[in-house]
Amino acid sequence: MRNPSTVVQENGSVSDFISQLGYFAFSSRFLNLNSEGCSGSSSHSLYLNGFENYRCVKRPPRSGASLSLSSRGSSSLRRFVNEFNNVIKFHCHKPPLGFASLGGVSDETNGIRDDGFGVSQDGALPLNKIEAENPKRVLILMSDTGGGHRASAEAIKAAFNEEFGNNYQVFITDLWTDHTPWPFNQLPRSYNFLVKHGTLWKMTYYVTAPKVIHQSNFAATSTFIAREVAKGLMKYRPDIIISVHPLMQHVPIRILRSKGLLNKIVFTTVVTDLSTCHPTWFHKLVTRCYCPSTEVAKRALTAGLQPSKLKVFGLPVRPSFVKPIRPKIELRKELGMDENLPAVLLMGGGEGMGPIEATAKALSKALYDENHGEPIGQVLVICGHNKKLAGRLRSIDWKVPVQVKGFVTKMEECMGACDCIITKAGPGTIAEAMIRGLPIILNDYIAGQEAGNVPYVVENGCGKFSKSPKEIANIVAKWFGPKADELLIMSQNALRLARPDAVFKIVHDLHELVKQRSFVPQYSG
């Protein structure tokens, strides 16, 4: 039986098999190439009729064409891959469908209609000649596939406001939900479904990892959503575009490149995964890629990004985490906690997911000293939007002090009131806990992007991993008792690894980048 505290390394042969499976599924089912090398489905063909100077040329049929493992089959496979890559390269350099209909602009009208909030409505691409007194416009691209992307976007927006005030206007948009047609606008809902069914998500993650798969997917997808995405991007007239999501690089960059705007708009990526991350995070044409760790920077280099485009600043978290922390006693009093007992923070994310109730009950038992008839610690539980869970926990008669909260906006105060934290391996929560010097017990992770966060925490001496509520409770009880020294050492390690000023370094570097293009005519018809 597998030890619940063991992190299983993703099997390389399994992921390779899945990648090959995904490749053949994509090439045979989506492309549906016939014997002439053309797609049998006109609606999904990568050889688009709209491009008159490029047509599918029929070739004489070849006898014995096969994808078998024989030498002839291997030759056919190599020939197919080469032809397939040529098609993808062609489509990555062609303007997306619908771009021509955006039309030109006149200098008199500037091609926009304003909605009263500084956001242009529809219209064509404006000719926006930046003046020194005009605020720069920042567009942050994210999607609600998990709470971390929005949290990073909000952190960057808050840092711009604190550091530069009215010199910057910052907009946050969910590009897929707000600016793509059905079914592409269902991305967050699809993600939530896949994550709840772990095997499906794991397969999706690894199938789309190979470059030949995700590059071709983006090229094909662009033909259907380019017009809407282009309008969605350009209505904000951005000076800077910041992507905080792995699916927000390839399609927007392709659109900007086809319009000749890549050397005029600062396009940057802020990676929000601490260690393991999907290859779609990286695109060679970004102006800058901000990495939260050296592990991610190494992956970016492997993906082909130039070292000069990389900055390792850390993960952006809310600026409120940088401010001096108030005394624990004061924070505990405000939160209704015991002012003297050591405290553990139990979290389940914004939706209050995971074994929170079972863990809280195990903590209540482990933190009660039967010999002396008194508690040795207390618990602060954050249930997020899960009101049913909060109601059940509040109805329990606990042996130790337990405070139950719903969705909280001042997480820095909750962390400041506690001595350690139990949470799943979300990168944002890990980064915030390290800033507060909280030893971390990870009780779960999402396969793929969060798998590497577990060894990142454990191997750096900042915490432990276990899926067993009973084992977790025993760890906390020892930290609050005979192993208090271990708790202190882990707290010091967390503070050493923390990067509280990451978000400010990011916005200041962005400020320097945009200053270099301050008087460049940005948008031309």
Swiss-Prot record:
Q: Where is the transit peptide?
A: 1-103
Catalytic activity annotation: a 1,2-diacyl-sn-glycerol + UDP-alpha-D-galactose = a 1,2-diacyl-3-O-(beta-D-galactosyl)-sn-glycerol + UDP + H(+)
Query: Which Gene Ontology CC terms are recorded?
Result: chloroplast membrane
Question: Organism's domain of life?
Answer: Eukaryota
Q: Which GO terms describe its biological process?
A: glycolipid biosynthetic process
State where it is primarily located: plastid
> Is Membrane among this UniProt entry's keywords?
yes
- Which Pfam families does the record cross-reference, listed alphabetically? Glyco_tran_28_C, MGDG_synth
| Cell compartment(s), UniProt | Plastid, Chloroplast membrane
Q: What is its EC number?
A: 2.4.1.46
Which GO molecular function annotations are given, in alphabetical order?
A: 1,2-diacylglycerol 3-beta-galactosyltransferase activity
What switches on expression, per the entry, is described as: By light and cytokinin.
What keywords is this UniProt entry annotated with?
Chloroplast, Glycosyltransferase, Membrane, Plastid, Transferase, Transit peptide
Question: What is stated as this protein's family in its record?
Answer: Belongs to the glycosyltransferase 28 family.
UniProt function note = Involved in the synthesis of the major structural component of photosynthetic membranes.
Q: Which PANTHER family match?
A: MONOGALACTOSYLDIACYLGLYCEROL SYNTHASE (PTHR43025), MONOGALACTOSYLDIACYLGLYCEROL SYNTHASE 1, CHLOROPLASTIC (PTHR43025:SF3)
Protein name, per record: Monogalactosyldiacylglycerol synthase, chloroplastic
Q: Which organism is it from?
A: Cucumis sativus (Cucumber)
